[in-house]
């Protein structure tokens, strides 16, 4: 389906990023796995090789908030596999605090990881992606945002602001690149079974005295299906946006939330 397309995925060591890596590997992509933990990336690469024996995979550790780190990782990736054809900006971080206790350091951290990181990665891969698109290989940029990019949630104001920024960046860049063979879209998952949600559960437990089951139910309650979204469901949506026939899907922010935003 996507044979030999070079896909670079940030936050690829676990959760949604790992699920996306598997989907794209099964579709025939060559993969560059990026993240801060080399051990997690190595473990994920070994898991991919076990499930997709012929996968071509490179580990390129990076901190998306560090421009030099991003450019070094992208240079390494392009030296191995050529221009990046599919960029999945998945790296993210959430931290909850009342706005009055959200200091400038926390605010900047949330923007740096969740918004500026996407900017850094797009800046680094775009020249090569555009060159490849001009030669007939379409480019895809998929930003993993959040329902927090489409609505508000209390006590995560910095995260919400950053994810709204990702949605805005997606729309603006989609228009800019619309005639250049590159599409830009955002996937906006609701609460998903990931490390971020597990940390949120522990935070609820420690601050409210609720049981873990009660905390998970509190997060699931926003989903009309009364459950957490699964990483594989997000990954399937990414594959759809990258596959043949998706050229007209551009500048969209697609909620994967069981209908949370429908009401």
Where are these regions (language model features)?
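Residue(s) in the substrate-gating loop at a strand-loop-helix junction
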Residues: 146
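Conserved glycine-rich cofactor-binding loop
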Residues: 13-15
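Alpha-helical segment proximal to the catalytic Tyr-Lys
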Residues: 127, 175-176, 247
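Active-site helix of classical SDR
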Residues: 122, 162, 170
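Short, small/polar-rich loop/turn modules that mediate ligand/substrate recognition or access, typified
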Residues: 178, 183, 249-251
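Short C-terminal tail/terminal secondary-structure segment
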Residues: 151, 238-239, 250-263
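Substrate-binding pocket helix/loop in short-chain dehydrogenase/reductase
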Residues: 98-99, 103-111, 219
């Amino acid at each position: 389906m996507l044979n030999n397309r070079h896909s670079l995925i940030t936050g690829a060591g676990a959760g949604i990023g790992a699920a996306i890596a598997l989907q794209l590997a099964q579709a025939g992509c060559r993969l560059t796995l990026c993240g801060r933990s080399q051990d997690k990336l190595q473990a994920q690469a070994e898991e991919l090789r076990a499930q997709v024996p012929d996968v071509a995979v490179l580990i390129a550790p990076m901190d998306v908030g560090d421009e030099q780190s991003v450019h070094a990782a992208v240079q390494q990736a392009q030296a191995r596999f050529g221009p990046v054809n599919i960029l999945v900006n998945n790296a993210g971080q959430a931290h909850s605090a009342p706005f009055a206790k959200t200091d400038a350091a926390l605010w900047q951290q949330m923007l740096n990881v969740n918004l500026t990181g996407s900017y850094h990665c797009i800046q680094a891969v775009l020249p090569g992606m555009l060159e490849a698109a001009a030669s007939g290989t379409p480019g895809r940029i998929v930003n993993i945002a959040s329902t927090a990019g489409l609505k508000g949630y209390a006590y995560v104001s910095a995260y919400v602001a950053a994810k709204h920024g990702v949605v805005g960046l997606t729309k603006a860049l989609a228009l800019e690149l619309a005639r250049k063979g590159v599409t830009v879209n955002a996937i906006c998952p609701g609460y998903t079974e990931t490390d971020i949600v597990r940390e949120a559960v522990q935070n609820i437990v420690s601050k409210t005295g609720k049981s873990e089951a009660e905390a998970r139910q509190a997060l699931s309650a926003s989903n009309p299906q009364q459950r957490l979204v699964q990483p594989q469901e997000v990954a399937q949506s990414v594959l759809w946006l990258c596959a043949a026939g998706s050229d007209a899907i551009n500048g969209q922010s697609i909620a994967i939330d069981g209908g949370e935003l429908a009401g």
